[in-house]
UniProtKB/Swiss-Prot annotation:
Regulates the dendritic spine distribution of CTTN/cortactin in hippocampal neurons, and thus controls dendritic spinogenesis and dendritic spine maintenance. Associates with the striatin-interacting phosphatase and kinase (STRIPAK) core complex to regulate dendritic spine distribution of the STRIPAK complex in hippocampal neurons. GO terms for molecular function: protein phosphatase 2A binding. Disulfide bonds: none annotated. Residues 203-222, 368-480, 500-620, 875-902, 1447-1495, 1575-1665 are annotated as: Disordered. Pfam families: AAA_lid_NAV1 (PF25408), Ank (PF00023), Ank_2 (PF12796), CortBP2 (PF09727). It comes from Dasypus novemcinctus (Nine-banded armadillo). This is Cortactin-binding protein 2. The modification Phosphoserine is found at residue 1526.
Length: 1665
């Protein structure tokens, strides 16, 4: 800008045009605002102002020249040259310098020059400022461009972040879910691993035990075999001697007879006497030789075999001795070998020989002259008792039949004997097949029974397909043979059909009659199972059989490993040439080889050169393989299962281990029927009965005489052990069966059935008169086995059949002892009810109590200790329980109080062989529960020592030592009493007088010093526990070296202690010890009394209210120092209680000092007037007349509920006298009679007031500076932690001093109640409703009921309906109906709430209920849904619209915005606002986010862009809504806040109660020149739950010229708007748009700054113009 005339010339010439343009613009834009001008407009304004200044300079210069002439004329025109004074004056003015001139009067020109200088200076300053402003403007423009670029970049990044977050969200959820599943699987797998490892350890232990037992059994059997060999050799020697003697006697008798005949005929034959003498000796010698060779095979064994089939085993040795006496002397040499009766009788006894047991059989056992292959009687008898099922070959039936005209084949029989001998020697390692039952699934009992019957005479195909033939009937004619073939075909068909269910599929059978080739005896089935069987060297084979007599002259040594060599030697000795037999022996390998690796050794004996005889069909004996494995049918029964936990002894013989396949094949040259080695072939096994032919069930083979029952008892045992009721009943129906037969271990069928828990089998056997108390070799009876295995039903059945319940085994174990040892609770109960003796001791001195304690079974010990036997005369079912009967479900408390132990003292203190009692065992093993039960017995002697002089305490673990140390301790509850500080009506009724904090353990050796320390430590720990931040038990608190708790209480807070009713002080000592003192005085509790207001202390107040002691002392100091104190805070902040307790404390302090004191309470209500307050002050001597002397009495006045009246009206006149308490500042009050008098407040008067209000407003603020205010904020101490401390103390008291774990449901419910109070106040503060805030008082009544969490929820619903909901409703209505006027106090409309306000209230209640109350409830959702209906306002739908579609208003429509937020130079556009549930925002919607700045509504911009798009109204998608409990509910809370605090609520009245079908309209008016653009924008949803960003919609407000109209749009509320009222909403929007221009102008001119504070009341401030 120019400063001289030359430089101003161009500007001057340009000035008129600029001035004129400016004038026209000024006329048109009167309403220009400097703050809202753009850059071009500012330049225009500056040019206009510059022209004005230049024009003013020209005018000044012209006026200045004109004024100079006038001035000279005016000043010097009156002077005259004749006047010297004037000349002097003129000369003076002209001669002096300008600085030295002192004007005589005021010079207007100097003034004008000064003004011009000032203007010039201002002009220069203004030019400088304009230049600086222009540079700042440029800089600002650059910054704005950078800011816009950064905003766009930020929006792009935010959009990309939201998209990535949306993409990754489901991946994270899936990963979290998968992680949870994997963690659960890990836990399950760990548990399974632990179980498997436990089972593995048990199996290892069992395996080791079995190995030891097997090794012991092997040694025993070896010794027994040696002994039997010795006996056998002795028997052989004796037999040979007797046989030689017999031969001599027979020869002598024959000689004598011949001599007699000779002497009779001597007279007649005197001539021939000399000739006949040499011929008589020769036949005798020949006969002797023949008798020696064939004497064993006479008919004697046949008669004995029939007679001794049921004889006892003990008689076997006698039969051996008697055997030679039954041999006939004269065999029929010319007759056929087998007569007709003999032929018919050979078959029943043929399959009874078992070399699996007769391992030392020799040739003499089998050499038969008249009947082939008839076993000796002892062999027949052993077949009945032999336990080795499935391992015995039917060797007798393998003897080839001979033609009737053939001579006795001595060589062949000796070969058979050798074969039998070799087979027998290889069978000693075979196992019993019962364990094989676990390998094959058991068939149905009906199938077995059918096979049992159908195949009594049938042949079976073995597993390799080799067909065998059944024994013939007695009719051996060809016709009967044809019938036999047909019968065999039919039986084979049935067998094959049944085999599908019971055995593996048979392979193709080779040609019948062909000799077997290759390894016939291979049996891969067992080896494939790969089951490890410990101790393969021996098996349980039952009782060892008696050894048959050997052939004279044979070796007495044990059989060699390869006995077939002996067969070769014996066959070479044969003297008579007969039919040659091909002997094929397959010997088993040594038993020491592991299972699965056994090798089948096969050696073919050289065949004889004699031609083979053709097969004779008259006698076809089946060839049974020796030692073949038992198939599924042989060992499978219904109910077959592996052996259970080892009982008192080893398993029965029928429950032995796996079958080891050992194959011995025999091939006859007469009838070459090949026998498979893998075919099951034991005569007494089930498979023989089912698939072969059985003598006892074959009527076709009955040829006279009783059928032999060999193997039936063993089969009976197997059926009983496996629970096959069908087979067992069939066997029991057979005649002559010994049901009491016992195997080698002494296990009978009844024992096996009871051991395996087969109740039906036990009942069948008991009904069949089985011996109920038959004991095994270890003395265990069936009742012992059932009790040990836990089969209580079998125990009941055996007891019902009068079993001996007190039977003691060899080791002294009774059934009760075994049941206790195995922890079988039901069996123990049954035995005790049967009256068993609990005091029976074992050989080691153990009692059932020892056994129960040794296993750590608490239930078993409780039954032994407390279960009473029924009285005589009452049955078990008729017995009525006694009042003190023990119940296992009662737990410890039930057994302590009512039941008395029935175990005598001597039994509970009985010591075993080592001197250990049951308490020793329990303490040493750490069974604390068992030891505790034993300690409850009054007669327990814990000081009893064992043989090593150790007491129970010496061998106990740490836990048990602690229990023993507290054994005789008295548990006295320690309680804290607050005395007379019970507030009653002055405060909270939920305070408790006494609280149990712990239980003191007082021992006999406890001293009074120890007792004092224990009480002090317990109090300190308790104070620390209730003031800590978490749930800690007293055992977890280690506060010995820590400072005092946060509440300020310690052992020094104790006033007195009472032991029962006897007062006691810390450190005091009585003559008796504490233990004796407590017992003598029957002190049931120790009560600690805290010092309270009566003693001038606040300790009891602190404990009762949980307000820290230091803060209470501070409040008391404020009252005593300032005299005027007001306690204010939210309702329920214990203001009245605190004031009253402080008053009590002050009163007792003053009384202790010798002053009288009085407390005056006054409850203020709406009708309480100032006159009443004056009378109160005067009557209480607080106000005394000026004339009266001061009083010494202390007066404490408490004004309660001051919030119900106006403080300024009530206390306004008392402020100055209360602040200056002296006669110098009196106040005059008028009495009721009209007289007035001067009064003043004296120094001994204290005034306390309580206000249940968060903050003061209006005129009440004038009172604030005259009082000392104590604010009790809900979010600050002492109120903030008071509820937590109080509820924690309540829980500790409920649990009698033992704080539960944080996971306990009670702790969770208490934490929930605490969280509800915090969240509720936080939400109410966020809503801007401080009047609805609540103190902790209402939550102090939270119920603490263990196990009943629903009680707390019901209490919360009642609290919500009675207190919280009405306060919130009142506060929300107050906010919604506020008329906001600038500079004035808010006034509440008294009209009833409108429909929209009711909707606001319902929405607020629903949000608070779900966000603050129900959120975090530990109840399950299903349980919580049952109580939601009890809460008021819980039915309001929270599916509020969460997304809006942007739509411009139609032409001619206007809307008013409640909150204007504009950004300069933003073009209008249409944006589709996405749903809140989807994080990916559109690009345009993201670009137009509004900056949330406080003064954003003050920025305006001119828009010259026309709106080119009009969006129609659209329906809201009902699926795009807020879900229950989402984070976006806080957005609705903020929207409610902004709605309630806005100036215009034209649309609130249109809100329905609860409608989700909503429609929203946004409209803008279009004009020819300008149109307002509407951008529906929103802030991104915050991820923080505490303060989510609210969603706002912002627009740009444009200011147009005189040709345009101002168009302002309005933010719509997020509350539901019904569809039916869309027209009303639209019309109302039009009406409100008419005045929007004026209101908006006023807003822009008058509002300097508008801050949206959610916690304070908004006010509009006017700036000074």
């Amino acid at each position: 800008m120019a400063t001289d005339g030359a430089s101003c010339e161009p500007n001057f010439s340009r000035a008129p045009e600029d001035v004129g343009a400016t004038a026209e613009a000024a006329v048109a834009t009167k309403e220009f605002d400097v703050d809202t001008l753009s850059k071009s407009e500012l330049r225009m304004l500056l040019s206009v102002m510059e022209g004005e200044l230049e024009a003013r300079d020209l005018v000044i210069e012209a006026l200045r020249a004109r004024r100079k002439e006038v001035f000279i004329q005016e000043r010097y025109g009156r002077f005259n040259l004749n006047d010297p004074f004037l000349a002097l004056q003129r000369d003076y003015e002209a001669g002096a310098g300008e600085k030295e001139k002192k004007p005589v009067c005021t010079n207007p020109l100097s003034i004008l020059e000064a003004v011009m200088a000032h203007c010039r200076k201002m002009q220069e300053r203004m030019s400088t400022q304009l230049a600086a402003a222009e540079s700042r403007q440029k800089k600002l423009e650059m910054e704005k461009l950078q800011l816009q670029a950064l905003e766009q970049e930020h929006k792009k990044l935010a959009t990309r972040l939201e998209e990535e977050r949306g993409k990754n969200k489901h991946v994270v959820l899936m990963l979290v879910k998968e992680c949870k599943q994997l963690s659960g699987k890990v836990i399950e797998e760990a548990q399974k691993l632990e179980e498997v490892m436990t089972k593995l350890e048990e199996e290892k232990k069992k395996t080791n035990e079995l190995e030891e037992e097997l090794s012991a059994e092997k040694r025993r059997s070896t010794e027994m075999e040696a002994q039997l060999e010795k006996q056998l050799s002795e028997f052989d020697i004796e037999r040979e001697q007797l046989r030689a003697k017999l031969n001599r006697e027979e020869a002598h008798t024959t000689d004598l007879k011949e001599e007699i005949d000779k002497m009779k005929k001597m007279i007649e034959q005197l001539k021939r006497g000399n000739d006949s003498k040499p011929s008589l000796s020769l036949p005798r010698k020949t006969k002797d030789r023949r008798l020696v060779s064939i004497s064993v095979g006479t008919e004697g064994p046949v008669t004995r075999s029939v007679a001794c089939q049921t004889d006892l085993v003990i008689e076997s040795t006698d039969h051996v001795k008697k055997l030679p006496l039954t041999v006939p002397v004269k065999p029929s040499t010319g007759s056929p070998l087998v007569s007709a009766p003999a032929k018919g009788n050979v078959c029943p006894s043929v399959p009874l020989l078992r070399p699996g047991i007769d391992r030392q059989a020799s040739h003499g056992d089998l050499i038969v002259s008249s009947v082939p292959a008839v076993p000796p009687p002892n062999a027949n008898r052993i077949e009945e008792n032999g336990p080795s099922i499935g391992s015995t070959p039917d060797l007798a039936s393998s003897t080839p039949p001979l033609p009737s005209n053939a001579a006795p084949p001595t060589g062949q029989t000796s070969g058979i004997a050798s074969q039998n001998y070799s087979q027998a020697s290889s069978m000693h390692s075979l196992h019993s097949p019962c364990a094989n039952a676990s390998l094959h699934p058991g068939p149905n009992p009906r199938i077995q029974a059918a096979r049992f019957r159908f195949q009594g005479n049938a042949n079976d195909q073995d597993q390799n397909g080799n067909t065998t033939q059944s024994p013939p009937s007695r009719d051996v004619s060809p016709t009967s043979r044809d019938n036999l073939v047909a019968k065999q075909l039919a039986r084979n068909t049935v067998t094959q059909a049944l085999s599908r269910f019971t055995s593996p599929q048979a392979s193709a059978s080779p040609r019948p009659g062909a000799p077997p080739t290759g390894d016939i005896g291979t049996h891969p089935a067992v080896s494939r199972t790969s089951l490890k069987t410990p101790g393969l060297a021996r098996v349980d084979r039952g009782n060892p059989p008696p050894i048959p007599p050997k052939k004279p002259g044979l070796s007495q040594a044990p059989s060699p490993p390869h006995p077939q060599l002996k067969a070769i030697m014996d066959s070479s000795r044969a003297s008579n040439a007969g039919a040659k037999v091909d002997n094929k022996t397959v010997a088993s390998p040594p038993a020491s080889l592991p299972q699965g690796n056994r090798v089948i050794n096969e050696e073919n004996l050289p065949k004889s050169s004699s031609p083979q005889l053709p097969p004779k069909p008259s006698i076809d004996l089946t060839v049974a393989p020796a030692g073949c494995a038992v198939s599924a049918l042989a060992t499978s029964q219904v109910g077959a299962r592996p052996a259970e936990t080892p009982g008192p002894t080893q398993p029965a013989c029928s429950d032995s281990s796996l079958v080891i396949p050992t194959t011995i094949a025999f091939r006859s040259s007469i009838n070459p029927v090949s026998a498979s080695a893998s075919r099951p072939g034991a005569s007494d096994s089930l498979l023989v009965t089912a698939s072969g032919w059985s003598p006892s069930l074959t009527p076709l083979l009955m040829s006279g005489g009783p059928a032999p029952l060999a193997g039936r008892p063993t089969l009976l045992q197997q059926a009983a052990a496996q629970g096959n009721v069908t087979l067992l009943s069939m066997l029991l129906n057979e005649e002559g069966l010994d049901i009491n037969y016992s195997c080698e271990d002494g296990h009978s069928a009844l024992y096996s059935a009871a051991k395996n828990g087969h109740t039906d089998c036990v009942r069948l056997l008991l009904n069949a008169k089985a011996q109920i108390d038959a004991a095994d070799k270890n003395g265990f009876t069936p009742l012992c086995a059932a009790a040990a295995q836990g089969h209580f039903e079998c125990v009941e059945l055996l007891i019902a059949y009068h079993a001996n319940i007190d039977h003691a085994a060899d080791g002294g174990q009774t059934p009760l002892y075994l049941a206790c040892k195995n922890g079988n609770k039901e069996c123990i109960k049954v035995l005790l009810e049967a009256g068993t003796d609990r005091s029976v001791k074992t050989r080691d001195g153990w009692t059932p109590v020892h056994a129960a304690v040794d296993t750590g079974n608490v239930d078993s010990l409780k039954l032994l200790m407390y279960h009473r036997a029924p009285t005589l005369g009452h049955s078990l079912n008729e017995e009525e329980p006694e009042p003190g009967a023990f119940d296992l479900d009662q737990g410890q408390e039930g057994s302590e109080g009512t039941a008395k132990p029935v175990v005598p003292t001597d039994l509970i203190n009985h010591a075993n062989r080592e001197g250990w009692t049951a308490a020793h065992i329990a303490a040493s093993k750490g069974f604390k529960n068992c030891l505790e039960i034993l300690c409850r017995h009054g007669g327990l002697e814990p000081e009893r020592k064992d043989k090593c002089n150790r007491t129970v305490h010496d061998v106990a673990t740490d836990d048990c030592k602690h229990l023993l140390e507290n054994l005789n301790a008295l548990k006295i509850p320690l309680r804290i009493s607050v005395g007379e500080t019970q507030p009653g009506s002055y405060g909270c009724d939920d305070f408790e007088c006494e609280n149990t904090i712990c239980a003191l353990n007082i021992h006999k050796q406890t001293s009074w010093d120890d007792f004092s320390k224990a009480v002090s430590q317990a109090l300190t720990n308790h104070f620390q526990a209730i003031s800590s931040d978490g749930w800690w038990s007293l055992e977890d608190m280690t506060f010995n070296n820590t400072p005092e708790p946060s509440i300020g209480l310690s052992a020094r807070s104790i006033l007195s202690i009472t032991l029962g009713n006897v007062p006691w002080s810390a450190g005091q000592c009585f003559t008796q010890a504490p233990w004796d003192f407590m017992r003598k005085n029957k002190a049931e509790q120790v009560t600690v009394l805290l010092s309270g207001p009566q003693e001038g202390c606040l300790n009891s107040v602190t404990y009762a209210s949980m307000i820290p002691l230091q803060m209470l002392q501070n409040y008391l100091r404020l009252v005593e120092q300032y005299h005027n104190v007001i306690f204010h805070g939210p309702e329920g902040s214990l203001q009245d209680y605190i004031a009253h307790q402080l008053a009590l404390c002050m009163k007792h302090r003053q009384m202790a000092a010798g002053f009288s004191c009085e407390i005056v309470r006054a409850e203020v209500d709406a009708g309480f007037s100032k006159e009443q307050l004056i009378d109160l002050f005067i009557n209480s001597a607080c106000l005394i007349p000026v004339k009266q002397s001061p009083v010494t009495k202390k007066i404490i006045i408490i004004l309660e509920n001051l919030e119900k009246s106006s403080l300024s009206e009530l206390l306004g006149d008392f402020l100055a006298p209360l602040e200056n308490r002296s006669t110098e500042s009196p106040c005059t009050f008028q009495k009721g009679n009209g007289t007035s008098e001067c009064y003043y407040f004296h120094e001994n008067c204290f005034l306390m007031g309580t206000i249940a209000k968060t903050c003061l407003q209006g005129s009440d603020l004038l009172v604030q500076q005259h009082f000392r205010w104590v604010q009790l904020r809900w979010d600050g101490e002492p109120m903030h932690g008071l509820l937590q401390r109080f509820l924690r103390r309540k829980v500790v008291n409920k649990f009698r001093g033992q704080a539960p774990s944080p996971c306990d449901p009670v702790c969770k419910m208490v934490d929930w109640a605490l969280a509800v109070w915090h969240q509720l106040n936080s939400c109410l503060a966020r809503l801007g409703t401080p009047d609805a805030l609540l103190g902790p008082k209402y939550f102090l009544s939270c119920p603490v009921v263990p196990g009943h969490a629903q009680v707390t929820v019901k209490w919360m619903s009642k609290l919500w309906n009675a207190i919280i909901a009405p306060k919130v409703q009142e506060a929300i209505l107050s906010r919604a109906s506020v008329k906001r006027q600038p500079g004035l106090r808010q006034t509440t409309a008294k009209k009833p709430p409108s429909q929209g306000q009711q909707a606001v209230v319902k929405a607020a209640l629903s949000i608070l209920l779900n966000k603050a109350v129900l959120h975090g409830c530990p109840l399950l959702r299903a349980e919580l849904d049952q109580y939601i209906t009890d809460f008021k306002g819980g039915s309001f739908p929270l599916s509020i619209v969460s997304s809006y579609n942007s739509c411009s208003k139609k032409k001619g429509e206007n809307g008013a915005w409640r909150k204007v937020s504009t950004n300069p130079r933003k073009k209008s556009g249409r944006f589709s606002s996405p749903t809140w549930s989807k994080p990916d925002l559109g690009e345009e919607g993201t670009k137009n986010k509004t900056m949330s700045q406080p003064n954003c509504n003050r920025i305006a911009s001119l828009s010259k862009q026309k709106s080119s798009e009009n969006d129609p109204s659209s329906m809201l998608n009902l699926d795009q809504r807020l879900s229950l409990g989402s984070d976006d509910e806080a957005d609705l809370v903020k929207e409610l806040q902004s709605m309630c605090s806005s100036k215009s609520e034209s649309d609130i009245s249109k809100i329905a109660d609860s409608r989700d079908d909503l429609r929203r309209f946004d409209s803008s008016e279009n004009s020819p020149a300008f149109s307002a653009a509407i951008n529906n924008l929103r802030m991104p949803v915050s991820q923080k739950e505490v303060s989510p960003v609210s969603s706002h919609q912002t627009t740009k407000r444009s200011t147009s010229t005189s040709k345009t109209e101002l168009s302002v749009s309005r933010v719509k509320s997020f509350l539901p708007v019904p569809r039916s009222k869309v027209s009303q909403c639209s019309q109302n929007t039009k009406r409100s748009s008419s005045s929007s221009n004026t209101r908006q102008t006023e807003l822009n001119n008058n509002s300097k700054e508008e801050i949206w504070n959610l916690c304070k009341n908004e006010q509009v401030q006017k700036p000074n113009k």
